[in-house]
Regions:
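N-terminal export/targeting and maturation segments
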Residues: 7-71, 155-157
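Mature extracytoplasmic domains of secretory-pathway proteins
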Residues: 50-121
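Charged, amphipathic alpha-helical segments
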Residues: 116-133
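Short, solvent-exposed mixed-charge patches
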Residues: 8, 162-163
Length: 163
């Protein structure tokens, strides 16, 4: 099911980087978790760390910081598995149910594909709507909005409600 959803009101857009894959924002605050491809040299991803993950802390003036150990191991970190040269399967540590596949296109740019509700998209952003009344140490998702492009290059957004 595809929805015509717009960006959340007043949420900042992180500064664009050359190797941006996607970013994640959530309903608790404006802080943003950014995922950039990590190239050793042009067209070749680092096998040791193919994705560079960091956060932009808008609650502290928009400064860039590494993930905390807690964030990396339990929330916004990723596990990765090499499929072939410049192709990796990625899993978010907080929810391994989403299969993300990172590839490098013929233009040398990296991108991430995922399938949500039987629709494959090139992912550019995720928004996590957290259930109200939960602590930060025991959060529950109400839904996830996936933003990106469909197979025809059209902008799309998909709402996923975890069961």
């Amino acid at each position: 099911m595809t929805f015509n959803l717009f960006a959340q009101d007043n949420y900042p857009t992180p500064p664009v980087t050359e190797n941006r894959l996607f970013y994640i924002q959530h309903s608790k605050n404006f802080n943003t978790y950014v995922y950039d491809a990590n190239f050793l040299i042009p067209n070749y991803l680092s096998e040791k760390e193919p994705v560079n993950i960091y956060r932009i802390v808008y609650t502290e003036g928009g400064i860039k910081k590494p993930l905390t150990t807690f964030q990396r191991k339990l929330a916004y970190g990723i596990d990765f598995f090499k499929i072939s040269q410049n192709m990796y399967k990625l899993k978010l540590v907080a929810y391994s149910g989403f299969q993300l596949v990172m590839k490098v296109g013929q233009d040398g740019k990296a991108f991430v594909e995922t399938t949500v509700n039987n629709q494959t998209i090139i992912l550019t952003r995720m928004f996590l709507k957290m259930k109200d009344g939960r602590s930060d140490f025991n959060p529950k998702l109400e839904y996830v909005l996936f933003y990106g492009f469909d197979n025809n290059g059209n902008k799309t957004s998909i709402k996923f409600v975890p069961s």
